């Protein structure tokens, strides 16, 4: 039996697995819960995510990836093994070939750590692809043409920005500001403005339900529960979408600055292509309400979100391994 080709979007917040011929078959949080006393893993993925902030002292839920790179090698390897087996089921007899994406700014050492962890987790061969290239492929862009395309991939831990032409990256940057930082900015704002302590899952709920990077046509509100920092007692506060814009302003500004930086380094001919074709957004972070409008306003360039931004990187990573297995076409 032939081995299966798999593409893995190894994200700080989520892991997505793409299988050739089936598409994205698995999407789970990059979280592992283990018992500190015995060092045994108790849960991986969604089950572990539900334990964050709700576990007894001996059970800790950790994210083994930080800002797009491995921060805990052995936990990452076990997590990868679990997800690969879960995605494949028990139907495979041969180790799969796997392509994994990494942020564009990683070092060779960080890249090697991802490759080694994937091999240890059960891969036959490993191909590494940079996230912006994977995102562009997954967004349906023909990256082989001599034409400039700009991708802004906002994940959980990093934002990767790149200008791509002829199958390669011409200019790129990777900034450690992304979806997780949106959540942290909301936590800080609630603490400072409302004396309310909230957890990361509550911050994420605020971001998803009323979060905004750009003023909404009409203000919406959400009742938020947390702990009053003055009394130490539970408290409910009503938060508005305008407040989230204020909370997120510093973080979104850093992403805009990085976009400007890449545009300033782009050769003139490719700049003209980008002005014509626009900027394409991918990654879960780009789903923040108003971010598309904010980038468009600050750059003056038409900005659009990919059809399925959450899965673009996983699809592109999977199609990359398909391309490698088939080899280049005659043309």
Q: What are the residue ranges of the model-derived segments?
A:
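Nucleotide/phosphate-binding catalytic cleft detector across ATP-hydrolyzing
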Residues: 1-154, 162-280, 286-331
């Amino acid at each position: 039996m032939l081995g299966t080709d798999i593409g893995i979007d190894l994200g700080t917040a989520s892991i997505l697995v793409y299988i050739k011929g089936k598409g994205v078959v698995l999407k789970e949080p990059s979280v592992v819960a283990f018992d500190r006393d015995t060092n045994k893993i108790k849960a991986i993925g969604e089950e572990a995510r539900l334990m964050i902030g709700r576990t007894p002292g001996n059970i800790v839920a950790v994210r083994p990836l930080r800002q797009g790179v491995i921060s805990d090698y052995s936990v990452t390897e076990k997590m990868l093994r679990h997800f690969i087996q879960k995605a494949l089921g028990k139907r495979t007899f041969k180790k799969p070939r796997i392509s994994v994406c990494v942020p564009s700014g990683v070092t060779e050492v960080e890249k090697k750590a991802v490759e080694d962890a994937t091999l240890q987790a059960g891969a036959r061969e490993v191909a590494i692809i940079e996230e912006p290239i994977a995102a562009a492929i997954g967004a349906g862009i023909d990256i082989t043409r001599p034409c400039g395309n700009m991708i802004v991939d906002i994940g959980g831990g990093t934002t990767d920005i790149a200008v791509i032409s002829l199958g390669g990256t011409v200019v790129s940057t990777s900034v450690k500001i992304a979806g997780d930082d949106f959540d942290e900015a909301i936590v800080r704002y609630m603490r400072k403005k409302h004396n309310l302590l909230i957890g990361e899952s509550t911050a994420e709920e605020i971001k998803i339900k009323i979060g905004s990077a750009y003023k909404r046509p009409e203000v919406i509100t959400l009742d938020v529960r947390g702990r009053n920092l003055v009394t130490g007692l539970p408290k409910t506060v009503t938060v508005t979408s305008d407040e989230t814009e204020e909370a997120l302003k510093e973080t979104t500004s850093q992403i805009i600055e990085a976009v400007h930086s890449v545009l300033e380094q782009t050769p003139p001919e490719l700049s003209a292509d980008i002005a014509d074709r626009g900027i394409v957004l991918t990654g879960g972070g780009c789903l923040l309400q108003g971010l598309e409008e904010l980038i468009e306003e600050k750059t003056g360039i038409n900005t659009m979100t990919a059809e399925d931004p959450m899965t673009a990187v996983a699809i592109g990573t999977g199609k990359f391994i398909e391309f490698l297995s088939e080899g280049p076409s005659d043309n």
